């Protein structure tokens, strides 16, 4: 539901990333895994929200944090492919860098905050397996791949873990293709032609820098909550 997908290459690949994310979330849900909230367009039942303690003001990503607390309380989360909510992709690399650092920090912090509950019997075996795979792919793989690339550059040897990265990017390319080919009642999704797919796959490489950087920063520096609102133009300008 990205309204400014056609504005630039950067907004185009972000729109494709949103379709990729929705497809992956749907697959996780259908496979008995864990579904997550997204900040744009949540519909919450008040009793479920109150049962898990409401919103957490000590996190930079309240949607991801709330996802885990709803999960451990036994609440189910569903997915609506065509929500009546639209969003704007960020329009510059500095804004993207700031946004993705916040997403990475909040996404990683919740594992540290709720790991006892995530390992308990509150979750089904399939949900625990899903979370383990998700953590390894989204957080561990970028850190290992970055360290592997730095080591190989320093020693002038071939990276050891490059096959894993290639598999991850290939699967992402397939998910891009499937997600962007689905019908949309909202803003039109970018067409998954070969050039767009290659650019979108290359764009995913920024996570292999953001995740390691945020992981090191969280390990070295004290926890600090710095939430910076992403600037938006608004409907009138976005349509121009």
Q: What do the PLM-derived regions correspond to, one by one?
A:
Residues 1-59, 97, 101-108, 112, ...:
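Long helical/loop segments within the catalytic core of UDP-sugar-dependent glycosyltransferases
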Residues 32, 58, 67-86:
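Catalytic donor-sugar/metal-binding loop of nucleotide-sugar-dependent glycosyltransferases
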Residues 65, 79, 84-108:
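C-terminal catalytic/acceptor-binding lobe
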Residues 97-139:
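Active-site-adjacent helix/loop segment of glycosyltransferases
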Residues 99-111, 195-239:
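Membrane-proximal soluble regions of multi-pass membrane proteins
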Residues 133-222:
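Membrane-embedded multi-pass helical conduit in multi-pass membrane proteins
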């Amino acid at each position: 539901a990205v309204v400014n997908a056609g504005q630039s290459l950067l907004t185009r690949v972000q729109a494709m990333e949103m379709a990729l994310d929705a497809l992956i979330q749907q697959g996780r849900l259908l496979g008995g895994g864990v579904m997550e909230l997204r900040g744009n367009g949540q519909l919450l039942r008040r009793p479920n929200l109150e049962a898990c303690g409401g919103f957490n003001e000590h996190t930079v990503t309240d949607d991801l944090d709330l996802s885990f607390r709803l999960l451990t309380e036994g609440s189910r989360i569903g997915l609506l492919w065509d929500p009546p909510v639209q969003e704007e992709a960020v329009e510059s690399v500095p804004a993207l860098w700031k946004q993705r650092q916040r997403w990475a920090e909040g996404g990683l912090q919740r594992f540290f905050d709720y790991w006892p509950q995530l390992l308990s019997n509150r979750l089904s075996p399939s949900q625990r397996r899903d979370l383990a795979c998700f953590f390894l792919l989204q957080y561990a793989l970028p850190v290992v791949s970055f360290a592997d690339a730095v080591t190989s550059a320093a020693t002038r040897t071939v990276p050891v873990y490059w096959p894993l990265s290639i598999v991850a990017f290939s699967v992402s390319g397939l998910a891009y293709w499937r997600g962007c080919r689905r019908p949309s009642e909202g803003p039109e999704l970018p067409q998954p032609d070969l050039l767009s797919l290659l650019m979108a796959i290359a764009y995913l490489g920024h996570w292999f820098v953001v995740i390691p950087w945020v992981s090191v920063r969280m390990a070295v520096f004290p926890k600090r909550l710095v939430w910076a609102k992403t600037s938006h133009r608004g409907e009138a300008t976005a349509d121009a």
